Curated annotation (Swiss-Prot):
Main localization of the protein described in the UniProt heading: membrane
Lineage: Eukaryota, Metazoa, Chordata, Craniata, Vertebrata
Compositional bias (Acidic residues): 180-196
Gene: Kcng1
Protein name per the record: Voltage-gated potassium channel regulatory subunit KCNG1
GO cellular component: voltage-gated potassium channel complex
Region (Disordered) location: 180-205
Organism: Mus musculus
Length: 514
């Protein structure tokens, strides 16, 4: 049967009869070199059924190199490696003897000129793509840390990664570095726990006390003392927040301004003193059990504790100095001068609420997300600033030209209106009256919704990932702690069994002698 043309062409298709496979006319399929073939000649993967001994002639050895990575073989021309002389594969060309070859690869087959590398073949696929195409990309299913080790082994710089892959690669490396820092902070604690069972009785007693103190202060899940200590800390933070709110009542403020102190004011001061005393004791205990005092003082939560505790003592010192300098003729002039400073210092007591981050996984996740999403927060702020700078002057000009009674007196006032409008708060203190002004307001509202939605997605994914990481880390610490306790109990039980055997044999010998 002859194929019939469907496009009214006059080409003779009779030679393409299906009766035989040998009827293909060479004129219909002209021989030409494919562009893809030229591109992929730089490197190719060999199939298992390929006969390597047929291509192991002397001429092929001079032109081709066979790489065996984890059991998968690749064929590369030597000219491909000339472009990458500093890589591990490029160093093979400079090898002059068998020892030099083995210093670069793991094994070498002289008969087939085959170099063996005991490495991950999946990662080498991306390396091979870089050698033949000049594009280095990180596959989604590949571990970034393993890929970093492969890059170091093959001698390829990370700068060759494409932009999108490099961003994801560096993010994973940064997250791993943060996890290693947290594990290094916990490693001295675990090592001290293991060293606390030393042979010296005095050192063992001191180490045991420090370990129990550390468990109570830093590890709420370690036992009953840690849970009680954490509950007391949260309770005192709550009492401090309530006490700060009560101290701002109008009646107490009037008494404070008049220099008087009623029973309620005295009770508020006593509650505040007790809470500050507890926080000071907690800070002292944390400082005593810290393995590195300098690292403890540099931590953000420690700085928050200092900023929250010191205003109380500074206020006491200032009040004492004011009472000593006060004269009957001057009244409260000195207190009037430092009154603003005292009010600011007392307002810093609200930072006690940040202490809840020690016991809340959610607050820790929030802080870690804010540290990781600084770029996204910067973009959000930039978007809002550009939009505010655009809509505020435009609304000011429109309202002052077209509205009968304009409410926008200046461009800075329009800035405030733009911030409230774009964040969809809408106080309603300033409202555009003209129709063009209302159109500008609608545009600013829609722009604010869209601009805030762009970075929020990335921030949400970062928050979810950070929460999972911290939760897994917390579970890992609990498992490590449980394993340590099980190991300790097994050692103690073994020692008790040995002592029973020892003393039991001694008592039996005594009975035999008797």
């Amino acid at each position: 049967m002859t194929l019939l043309p469907g496009d009214n062409s006059h080409y003779d298709y009779s030679a393409l009869s299906c009766a035989s496979d040998t009827s293909f006319h060479p004129a219909f399929f002209p021989q030409r070199q494919a562009i893809k073939g030229v591109f992929y000649r730089r490197a190719q993967r060999l199939r298992p059924q390929d006969d390597l001994h047929q291509s192991c002639s002397l001429g092929d050895r001079r032109r081709q190199i066979i790489i065996n990575v984890g059991g998968i073989k690749y064929s590369l021309p030597w000219t491909t490696l000339d472009e990458f002389p500093l890589t591990r594969l490029g160093q093979l060309k400079a090898c002059t003897n068998f020892d030099d070859i083995l210093s670069v690869c793991d094994d070498y087959d002289v008969t087939c000129n085959e170099f063996f590398f005991d490495r991950n073949p999946g990662a080498f696929g991306t390396i091979l793509t870089f050698l033949r195409a000049g594009k280095l990309r990180l596959l989604r299913e590949m571990c970034a840390l393993s890929f970093q080790e492969e890059l170091l082994y093959w001698g390829i710089a990370e700068d060759h990664l494409d932009g999108c892959c490099k961003r994801r690669y560096l993010q994973k490396i940064e997250e791993f570095a943060e996890m290693m820092e947290r594990e290094e902070e916990e490693e001295p604690l675990d090592s001290e726990d293991q060293e606390s069972e030393g042979p010296s009785a005095s050192e063992g007693r001191l180490s045991r006390c420090m370990r129990r103190l550390r468990d109570m202060v830093e590890r709420p899940h370690s036992g009953l003392p840690g849970k009680v200590f954490a509950c007391l800390s949260v309770l005192f933070v709550t009492v401090t927040a309530v006490n700060l709110s009560v101290s701002t009542l109008p009646s107490l403020r009037e008494e404070e301004e008049q220099g008087q102190c009623s029973q309620m004011c005295h009770n508020v001061f006593i509650v505040e003193s007790v809470c500050v005393g507890w926080f000071s004791l907690e800070f002292l205990l944390r400082f005593i059990q810290a393995p590195s005092k300098f690292a403890f003082l540099r931590s953000p939560l420690t700085l928050i504790d200092l900023v929250a505790i010191l205003p109380y003592y500074v206020t006491l010192l200032v009040d004492g100095a004011a009472s000593s300098r006060r004269k009957p003729s001057t009244g409260n002039s000195y207190l009037d001068k430092v009154g603003l400073v005292l009010r600011v210092l007392r307002a810093l007591r609200i930072l006690y609420v940040m202490r809840l981050a020690r016991h809340s996984l959610g607050l820790q996740t929030l802080g870690l997300t804010a540290r990781r999403c600084t770029r996204e927060f910067g973009l959000l702020l930039l978007f809002l600033c550009v939009a505010i700078a655009l809509f505020a002057p435009l609304l000011y000009v429109i309202e002052n030209e077209m509205a009968d009674s304009p409410e926008f007196t200046s461009i800075p006032a329009c800035y405030w209106w733009a911030v409230i409008t774009m964040t969809t708060v809408g106080y309603g203190d300033m409202v555009p009256r003209s129709t063009p002004g209302q159109v500008v307001a609608l545009s600013s509202i829609l722009s604010g919704i869209l601009l805030m939605a762009f970075p929020v997605t990335s921030i949400f994914h970062t928050f979810s990932r950070s929460y999972l990481e911290l939760k897994q880390e917390q579970e890992r610490v609990l498992i490590r702690r449980a394993q340590y306790l099980i190991k300790t109990k097994s050692q103690l039980s073994g020692m008790s069994q040995d002592s029973d055997i020892l003393f039991g044999s001694a008592s039996s010998d005594t009975r035999d002698n008797n």
